[in-house]
Amino acid sequence: MLFGTYEHCMDAKQRLTLPAKLRNKLSNPIYLTKGYDADLEIWSKDDFLLKIKEILNQQNDQKDIRNIERIIWSNTVEIDIDNLGRIKIPYNLIQNLNIGKDVFILGLGNRLEIWSKNKYNQHKNQFIKNLNS
């Protein structure tokens, strides 16, 4: 199980070191994809395929299924964790989500999320504000 919040920095080559507690629970290859919010998600192969199957099984319309498949598969890359515990994040995923050098890595049970530090703080604060309203 993946859990916790970790603050890390991406290097100039768009590499991010995963916390040892998290990377020891993952094996190559892993799947990096756009999340539902302004984040990236990291999945193990088995969990990623289960999630895709679950999403597609909820759809009845073939057109919707094709569109969902396009969005998911075109925004997913298979990557490996290198021997130093780093992943290289493709530039297009960083640019599309405006993820900067400073990030949070969140463990969410069966996946990791990578957030821009500023965006995550804004997202979290807005959620807390809405809860208190």
From Swiss-Prot:
Its main location: cytoplasm. GO terms for cellular component: cytoplasm; nucleoid. Residues 5-47, 76-119 form the SpoVT-AbrB domain. One of its GO terms (biological process) is negative regulation of DNA-templated transcription initiation. It comes from the Bacteria. InterPro entries: MraZ, MraZ_C, MraZ_dom, MraZ_N, MraZ_sf, SpoVT-AbrB_dom, SpoVT-AbrB_sf. One of its GO terms (molecular function) is transcription cis-regulatory region binding. Keywords: Cytoplasm, DNA-binding, Repeat, Transcription, Transcription regulation. It is found in: Cytoplasm, Nucleoid. SUPFAM superfamilies: AbrB/MazE/MraZ-like. Pfam families: MraZ. The keyword Transcription regulation applies. The keyword Heme does not apply. Belongs to the MraZ family. PANTHER family: TRANSCRIPTIONAL REGULATOR MRAZ. Forms oligomers. HAMAP family: MraZ. This is Transcriptional regulator MraZ.
